[in-house]
Amino acid sequence: MKVVIFGSSGDLAKRKLFPALSRIDLEGVGVVGYARTKYNIEFSEVLQEVGNYSPEFLSKVTYIPGPYDDLSKLKEVSDSETVLYFSVPSSVYTCLFREISKLDYKVIGVEKPYGDSIESFMEIKGFDLGKTRFIDHYLLKPLVVAMPGIIRETGAIREVMSNRYVKSVEIVSKEVLGGEGRHYFDKNGIIRDMVLSHMGELLGVVASDVTKPSRIMEALARMEVFKACTVDTERCIYGQYDDYIKEIHKDSSTETFCMVPISIGTPRWSKVPFIIVAGKGMNEKRTEIILEFRRDVFAKCIELFSMPRQSSCRIVHTNEIETVRLVFNIYPECEVFLEVLVGGEPVRYVLHDKKEIDGLMHDSYGGYHDYEIIFDSLVRGKDFSSVSSQEAELLWKVFNPILSISKEDMLFYYSKGIDMPKEAEEMIREIKDH
């Protein structure tokens, strides 16, 4: 049995895919790297330049240089027990799917973005995808795995997850890392890189109503959310941090920051703005979903969550409360908490902590995480959360209105290392107060 990594000379393969493969049980499994790059040193040396690997793992790895429009070198390698994994530019996908149809294989894993446009995705959809899994590793983050069950089984949380209580929902991803050396990012931008996949899936998870513990039901529920989503294109804003052009050594109108408001046309979420915020070159790495409650239900929220009305120093009266938020912090805390703002100071009440969430994650996937789960599942034929072609198509349809336009004349510029651009803060306030 073999795992073939297409694009094995790339950043993702070297930073995440090969390290994940080295941490799972690969007894009886060989690993083949395939890419256009020709090396004048052993591929094992290439891998060791960016990671630490055991001699046992490196002995399993071979490397084949070759083009993506001619996979004849793989005919002797790939058989009905071979896992194929796409970690190549999405512009290559159509060509690669065409060539792979000439090979035997067990299953294909496909990295996001699934194509470089909605048109190219529809071309991909025209191939036989019966043995293809579209991958989004955010669906395998511990809190994202646990979230449907937490919402379903925590009475207070389930009660407040609707427009009867919620004023707005922010889905936020902040990264310190910029675009340094990443030509892939400059071609795609933050919307195609993050929003079309990871942030869209987080929206689907938090807004869906899953009544039974089933991955199929969870996926269907996300799809129902996406069918009802509309992007407010007039209020979207796009930014680029001020050092970006210097870092990539060329002029660019690629957005490194975006704020995307979305409405969900269902009775449950009608008139609640969902605001996706994603940025690189920020002051911290943080991923979280923030549900802000309406002022008229503050007291009810405090009662529902049985939150003590006493901070560390004094009693908190309802009329002193400025804001009440329910936060699903995916990173770095990995916990669910209620946050009450009193006198400008937040009082936090943890509802589900990291230890509990890690336990729920272990119940679902054992001791593996992220790409370890993906490769172990593909190799062993196990079920795991992934994206169907129908779900991927719906996400393309939701975000295509802002993916298909030039943003060159729309960009604002922000300082690298900022907490949040003032342009985004002002627009978020305007949307919430509308």
Swiss-Prot record:
Residues reported to bind NADP(+) 1: G7, S8, S9, G10, D11, L12, A13, K14, R36, Y93, K112
Residues annotated for NADP(+) 2 binding in this entry: R286
Annotated active site: H198 (proton acceptor)
InterPro entries in UniProt: G6P_DH, G6P_DH_C, G6P_DH_NAD-bd, NAD(P)-bd_dom_sf
Chain positions recorded as D-glucose 6-phosphate binding sites: K112, H137, Y138, L139, L140, K141, E175, D193, K280, K285
Pathway(s) of this molecule: Carbohydrate degradation; pentose phosphate pathway; D-ribulose 5-phosphate from D-glucose 6-phosphate (oxidative stage): step 1/3
Pfam families: G6PD_C (PF02781), G6PD_N (PF00479)
Protein function: Catalyzes the rate-limiting step of the oxidative pentose-phosphate pathway, which represents a route for the dissimilation of carbohydrates besides glycolysis. The main function of this enzyme is to provide reducing power (NADPH) and pentose phosphates for fatty acid and nucleic acid synthesis.
The protein's name in its UniProt record: Glucose-6-phosphate 1-dehydrogenase
Species whose genome carries this gene: Encephalitozoon cuniculi (strain GB-M1)
Gene responsible for this protein: ZWF1
